[in-house]
């Protein structure tokens, strides 16, 4: 597998709007080669008999089921409110809307 060239790193840097100096181009070229090599090794391991997954554990929606339970009446909920209007909490206006 041919390595990443300085020109390719410079092109990627331009696309990312990064300004890299000459020694940085060499440094990042080596790092990108290492990353591409690691991805290639993972690709070799990921065989046809290993299904692609988005999560390592087979968990789906581990939340409890909804159930109706007794709760406060509107009057009880509003009993401690400093201000209320039409069975709702009344709060100071924070936006400039009427």
Curated annotation (Swiss-Prot):
One Gene Ontology molecular-function label: asparaginyl-tRNA synthase (glutamine-hydrolyzing) activity
Swiss-Prot/TrEMBL keywords: ATP-binding, Ligase, Nucleotide-binding, Protein biosynthesis
Region annotation Disordered: where it falls in the sequence: 75-98
Reaction(s) this enzyme catalyzes, per UniProt: L-glutamyl-tRNA(Gln) + L-glutamine + ATP + H2O = L-glutaminyl-tRNA(Gln) + L-glutamate + ADP + phosphate + H(+); L-aspartyl-tRNA(Asn) + L-glutamine + ATP + H2O = L-asparaginyl-tRNA(Asn) + L-glutamate + ADP + phosphate + 2 H(+)
Highest taxon listed in the record's lineage: Bacteria
Pfam families: GatC
UniProt record, GO biological process: glutaminyl-tRNAGln biosynthesis via transamidation; regulation of translational fidelity; translation
InterPro entries xrefs: Asp/Glu-ADT_sf_sub_c (IPR036113), GatC (IPR003837)
Classification via Gene3D superfamilies: Glu-tRNAGln amidotransferase C subunit, N-terminal domain
Keyword flag Protein biosynthesis: yes
E.C. code: 6.3.5.-
Record text on subunit structure and interactions: Heterotrimer of A, B and C subunits.
NCBIfam families tied to this protein: gatC (TIGR00135)
Function: Allows the formation of correctly charged Asn-tRNA(Asn) or Gln-tRNA(Gln) through the transamidation of misacylated Asp-tRNA(Asn) or Glu-tRNA(Gln) in organisms which lack either or both of asparaginyl-tRNA or glutaminyl-tRNA synthetases. The reaction takes place in the presence of glutamine and ATP through an activated phospho-Asp-tRNA(Asn) or phospho-Glu-tRNA(Gln).
Protein family membership: Belongs to the GatC family.
Name of the protein in its database record: Aspartyl/glutamyl-tRNA(Asn/Gln) amidotransferase subunit C
């Amino acid at each position: 597998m041919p390595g990443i060239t300085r020109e390719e790193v410079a092109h990627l840097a331009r696309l990312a709007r990064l300004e890299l100096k000459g020694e940085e181009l060499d440094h990042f070229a080596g790092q990108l080669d290492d990353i591409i090599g690691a991805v290639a090794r993972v690709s070799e391991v990921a065989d046809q008999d290993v299904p692609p997954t988005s999560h390592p554990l087979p968990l789906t929606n581990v939340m409890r089921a909804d159930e109706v339970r007794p709760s406060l009446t509107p009057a009880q909920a509003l009993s401690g409110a400093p201000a209320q209007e039409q069975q709702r909490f009344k709060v100071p206006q924070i936006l400039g809307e009427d």
